[in-house]
Amino acid sequence: MPIIHVLIAKNTGAVLCEYTDYQGNFLTIARMILKNIKQNTRHTVQYESYQCHYINQDNLTYLCITSNFPEDTTFAFLMEVQKQFLAQNNYDDIMKEQSYFFQNFKNNLKNILDYYNKCPEKTLNGEIIKNLVDAKSIAIENVEKLIDRDQKLNITVQKSDKLYDQSKNINSLANSIKNQKKA
């Protein structure tokens, strides 16, 4: 089964935008869940035969209702909803507006929902691969920086050893000249 219902709400319970293609009491279920959400959490709640997944961050909740849908894909879906919603809307404006003010975002919700419903595993695998490639490139970059630092440190140590040897030679030369003058 697919992602059935998606909504974006403020912590006050005001639903800013929602979308579903299905008939049912999904908004009622969502409102019951919204009442019990703690700030800055990510969780899945079972309600009868449905799973309600949500991300609450910065006083906004991104919630969807699914039936037998991969949890990882669901959270990838919610993060995409969050990313696009915040990219299109100013946070301060979001906090000022009333319920259903952002229904113009409904088409975006539909497009994201359709995309994730059509190929959930492929979408998740693509996200995982992208994240792994990004992590790999960052790790390679960090290793290259470490190697570069190590090389610079080795050069500095070699120069330091050379200067130390030179200072010992100069010191013993100075001592021998001093001893010759005394004699």
Predicted regions mapped to residue ranges:
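Acidic, low-complexity cytosolic segments
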Residues: 2-3, 12-183
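Generic short beta-strand
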Residues: 5-7
